[in-house]
Amino acid sequence: MGNGITKNPCFSGDPYAAAVASDPLPDDSHGHSFTYVPSSAAAFDHSPRSAAASSETSYFSLSGAAISANPATSASMPSFRLYNELTWPPSTACTFESSRSFAAAPLIQAAPPRLSMSGPLHATSGRFSEASGSASTASDRFSDHPFMDGMLDRASSASSTARLMPSFSHLMSEPRVAQSGLSNERSLIRSLVRVASKLRFGVPLSGRRSNGPAEPTTKSDGDYRSTPKGNVEWAQGMAGEDRFHVAVSEEHGWVFVGIYDGFNGPDATDYLFANLYVAVHRELKGVLWDDIQGVDVVTDNLPDPALANATHLCFLDAGGVGGGGDDDPDAERKAKRGRIERNADDDGASSVHRDVLKALARALARTEEAFFAAAEERAAQSPELGLVGSCVLVMLMKGKDVYLMNVGDSRAVLARRREPDFKDIFFRPDQDLQLLKAEVMRELEAHDRNGLQCVQLTPEHSAAAEEEVRRIRSQHLTDRQAVVNGRVKGKLSVTRAFGAGYLKQPKWNDRLLEAFKVDYIGAEPYISCTPSLRHHRISSNDRFLVLSSDGLYQYFTNKEVVDQVAMFTAEQPDGDPAKHLVGELVLRAARKAGMDCRRLLEIPHGDRRNYHDDVSIIVMSFEGRIWRSSV
């Protein structure tokens, strides 16, 4: 697998050079996995003022993997199709490219026989290390993984036949070549701005409806924190109809992750890939990139540690923000007043967190507005553009603050170590000392046995959620078929999505062929692009965060995902937990179909969608309060 290094703006002589796709993955590849560990000196800190007041520093490690089930499809709009061809190699269902700080490997089917491992699991410290009590009883099947081990040597030639490395630790022990040369002087965002401008993919700026390209308002627009030499490491890929990208600035202490799970074609996901990252950056300029000083999280002195952590969780359903749709007629008024629904009675999120969440919502709303404006120009020739859509999951981490935005059924699941609960033990009157000791021991044993807790940070916008069904039916009282057979109008399982205009405006439905039309009653939208937003403050109990498209949860519960990552990383702390999850998904899909995984992987793309979906997974590890990589 190549990397397209010389073709990427981070390494080319032209700072505004368009990004070009890397060489395609090997023909026998089913997807890709990748890892990223910050340099040993990198610390994701807060503002200087807060850093001086606290010795806590955030470190993280990132693991990702994606597998495709759907074949590659062509975009409907010529400009979309051109961008698709510029970005992704033709006739490939999956591809990946990145800056050189990411270690990556294709998912290639492992050759039998596979030797079984034996012996008990032992908790081991490392990048992704936290043994879970319930996970320790799970199947020890690491050696039965359906894919080959090893990482690509990114220092080798950029051909798709680059040699496999036996261990990720070997790569990380080499000099970090990405910290030198032109990679420190170029920014991925500039290439996206440039390509978007050429292909009329611009996002209208605030207060302006634009049918043409949206150029940066200043030379610094589109560059991180207005610095001409922002050091940004990045990765991007596709798997069937899924798209994802990751951007990391160690210098300024932030991470951006976007996962876009498309349906009915690639136009919406490719548009999101080209535009949402740029739009988020523009909206956050002056809010986060300029790093407003001296703003700390409001925390009350609460007696219960679990409750104290809950005060760092704030939730805002962004109706009316940035001109988007509305679930609640009072939502815009509430948003203007800055009201935030919290998990505990607290003073509310600080203004900076509220502003970041609003900025994310505005970026998404304006990106969808621009998407429909561009699609409108080709609606007569390509009415099927009214069908295409995508789920959206965005994570932005700045220091210890994690901001999440989701539309659809992709998930962000947090793994957290629960604190032992002694409050019902120590405060009993006339407690016998021996009995007290016994109950303390039982609580500690239960704590170890229960292992990690899983917390789903993003709500699910699908017809499986009763509150979403009630919302849609309340908005369409005269339509008894608003939600039928677990789908909106019998067509779409998600209740919120980017695009999918045929369920938002009657005109898009009217343009479709009769076979694709729905019985659109009235003028109100059936689905919306109103995102759910959440801010979470990383605590000493938080271990890792799993971001993924919904295909992962076709075969896993939230708890099973957390336990699988914990079990795998306890045994293989230098391993790739996201790749392990993909391998376990293939094993479960094959078992359900009554076949072995080799036979499943031989099924062509398209037909394989009957067994599993496209899946994109990002696992981020925060090893406690102060976490350092083992490098």
From Swiss-Prot:
Residues 221-622 form the PPM-type phosphatase domain. One of its GO terms (molecular function) is protein serine/threonine phosphatase activity. Mn(2+) 2 binds at D261, D550, D613. Pfam families: PP2C. It catalyses: O-phospho-L-seryl-[protein] + H2O = L-seryl-[protein] + phosphate; O-phospho-L-threonyl-[protein] + H2O = L-threonyl-[protein] + phosphate. PROSITE patterns: PPM_2 (PS51746). Its cofactor is Mg(2+); Mn(2+). Residues 131-140 have a biased composition (Polar residues). GO terms for biological process: signal transduction. Mn(2+) 1 binds at D261, G262. It is an enzyme of class 3 (hydrolase). Keywords: Hydrolase, Magnesium, Manganese, Metal-binding, Protein phosphatase. InterPro entries: PP2C, PPM-type-like_dom_sf, PPM-type_phosphatase-like_dom. Residues 119-142, 205-231, 324-347 are annotated as: Disordered. Binds 2 magnesium or manganese ions per subunit. Its EC number is 3.1.3.16. Belongs to the PP2C family. PANTHER family: PROTEIN PHOSPHATASE 2C, PROTEIN PHOSPHATASE 2C 31-RELATED. This is Probable protein phosphatase 2C 31. It comes from Oryza sativa subsp. japonica (Rice).
